[in-house]
Amino acid sequence: MDCRIKSGNDERACHLRPYAPADEDAAIALWLVTWQATYPQFDFAGRLDWWRAHWRRLAQAAKIVVATGAGEAMIGFVTIEPHTHYLDQLVVAPDHWGKAVAAALMTEAKRLCADFIDLDVKTDNARALGFYKKHGFTVTGDGINEFSGRPIFHMRWRAGA
């Protein structure tokens, strides 16, 4: 599936495709750079062993869609578990923030789970909160992330709402 990357008056093609096991290292590297840009005060490099194990569990249970740009470099991905409708990760390279890559990945997630999608987002992640609200998600509750201990919002998108 093709998508468009927008930057001012410039538009470039991107491509959405299913994840392949050969993508693992690129996905893990992209996760690291993206989360470090979002929360520079935290040591995400120190969490790489945890993340690799988590990623491998996701790869078994979830549908993963990868966004690629020029030269087929990975610029984003979304993971969604079709049985639970849980969106675990929506990651876009910082230099592609605001350029419609996340929107294309969200559209694909909604296609894969057309009834509803649940997710958790850190309460202080204003960029993500704004994005999810723009795409029809509403806050359904709050809690604490069991890994980080940080406060989160539970959010849901429901088709037709």
Question: Regions from the language model: what does each represent?
Answer:
Residues 1-22, 157, 161:
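Conserved N-terminal entry element of GNAT/NAT acetyltransferase domains
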Residues 1-7, 94, 107, 112-114, ...:
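Intrinsically disordered, low-complexity, positively biased terminal segments
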Residues 18-95, 106-108, 112:
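Acetyl-CoA-dependent GNAT
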Residues 62, 149-155:
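Short hydrophobic/aromatic beta-strand or adjacent loop that forms the aromatic wall/cage
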Residues 93-95, 99, 123-124:
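Active-site acidic-Proline motif in GNAT/NAT acetyltransferases
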Residues 103-104, 124-141, 147-151:
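Conserved active-site alpha-helix within GNAT-family acetyltransferase domains
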Residues 112-124:
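Conserved GNAT acetyl-CoA-binding A-motif
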